[in-house]
């Protein structure tokens, strides 16, 4: 079902299974918890077991970006069939490229943790609480998260974007791990990394380049596993 989140992000046939379960198997809502609408200090909370549209669509851009919460309201999954990069000449954004003029309050953000977008403004994601988690500042600005955003932006977009966010327990605000899959020019990869300063990690991110049949989800009879290699995080300039 829509709330049966896998342990890591998926690609290929497994992505299609997740997309259909999330988009076709549940009611998608438009809950806007952007800072410009609720205030940057309003301690709004996410609804549990909810699928929310988080793509910027005010200028009729057909973005289909969806966030999924679990039964305690943690943001655990984000999925998009196509990432449509922001066009600041045609879309309504601030002079900093934001769709919302203020960021919302994010529990546990601050003290070394940014209010980190799962899908950045530059990639068409809103500053919605359903698109934000407390992310270690260096990771968000210079680590794998920044690298992914920069790579997709320079490529002019991506397909089959899937993020899975892991927490130490069902009540925690701060994630322990992100796993993000996406395809550029037909080549898929999954980057899985801890929510910590990349300079403090020893092995770097785990990166896979899977094929279509690398994951097992309900309804699939697949047993292959992807080849995994350890690579040091690459750096990029922040948004």
Question: Positions of the model-derived regions?
Answer:
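N-terminal leader or domain-start segments enriched in small/polar residues
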Residues: 45-46
